[in-house]
Amino acid sequence: MILIRYCFYLEITMSASLSVAKLTFFIAILAAVGQATQTMYVPSIGYMAQEFLVSPAALQAVMACYLIPYGLSQFVYGTLSDRIGRKPIIIAGLAIYIIGSLIALFAHQYSWFLVGSFVQGLGIGCGGAMSRTLSRDCFDGAELHKVNSLISMCLIFSPLVAPVLGGYLTESFGWRSSYLFLSLFAIAVVITMMTSMVETLPAAARKKEPVLRSYHYVLSDRRFQGYLICLVATFAGLAVFEAAAGVLLGGVLGLPATTVSLLFVLPIPGYLAGAWLSNVIARHWREKTAMRIGLLAILTGSLVIMLPGLLGLTTAWSLIGGATIYFLGAGILFPAATTGALSPFPYHAGTGGAILGGMQNLGAGLATLFAAMFPASDQLPLGIIMLLMSVLALWGLKRVYTKQPPSDEMPIAI
């Protein structure tokens, strides 16, 4: 028994010793695959619509077909990773993603392209779950919040820089070149993970309890529920913007692909500032203060987008300006809420990360599917949906900070 405990201690120490820089690099390239897939095709919407003989608005369904399996698959990846480790899950998921990318690359019918997008989401769900889990394996407390803020700053680049690269590739080589790039990038990432990544969950720390018991244990915490609602709603607002803005900027305003891709980059400073502020505010004041400021920002950004829509207007400045403010708030909320949600679960990090990642992407997929039902003639539907998501995030945070009855307290971990 003493020998087992000593080996367990050594393995935990090895995991904790993984440097912040190296951990951030692994998480960044893993998450970048999935996030780049989500937005790289946006500047190509017009070209894809012409080739597949569908309307540009119909291509909003691509993001829904990608995000829904992306979210659902994380429920499987997370609990499996608590049992067999993180590395095997990452490698298997990336292999499935590569197959989906190749299907999308060679698809000549819209239905097959949607199948490819579905398989992509099914595979890269491993990245969504593990990007939240790896940091919890190695850090906790204030250090975990700091690491999550740093990771958030790195992760925002891929979904917003990807359209710039996608626009360039589309103009130079055609829209299919974006999916060739994604396939090659995923192959490079899986090789890196196989050769350089060390397992962050030691064998002695792996949970063998039934899946439903793991989910019940995590979801029984009222604060986790509130953080989850906040994260799902905030991310859904981001996803709806990413899906609709390309249609509005390219389809309604008639801007060229390169201009649309450059406009997508402009909200980046807002998110970076938010992720930096989240760490500063949490360190000098309280987590609650960071959450309030982030919530105020996403509400304000939603209103900036919605108000011109009430007048039947669609303008680039209100879309990008409102998105920048919304991204600022999201940058503050994401690391703070993720840290608050996962901190109580050191032995259920995979399950907790899977729930957060899975529900965020499932919620985003359903929100974009809902948004696709409305005509994309102006920015009013986008503004209304983003405002509704902000109000839902407010309700989630209210649940976090409302004291729960003693009977609802989270059970003691075994």
Feature names for model-found ranges:
Residues 53, 85, 106-112, 123, ...:
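Helix-breaking motifs and short loop linkers at transmembrane-helix boundaries and internal kinks
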Residues 96, 100-103, 111-119, 317-323:
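Paired small-residue
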Residues 22-56, 77, 241-246:
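Extracytoplasmic
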Residues 72-111:
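Conserved MFS/SLC helix-loop-helix module at the cytosolic interface between two early adjacent transmembrane helices
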Residues 340-376, 385-386:
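A late C-terminal transmembrane helix in Major Facilitator Superfamily
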Residues 15-16, 198-228:
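Juxtamembrane intracellular "pre-TM" segments in multi-pass secondary transporters
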Residues 112, 141-142, 149-195:
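Helix-loop-helix hairpin linking two adjacent transmembrane segments in secondary transporters
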Residues 116-157:
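Cytoplasmic helix-loop-helix junction between adjacent transmembrane helices
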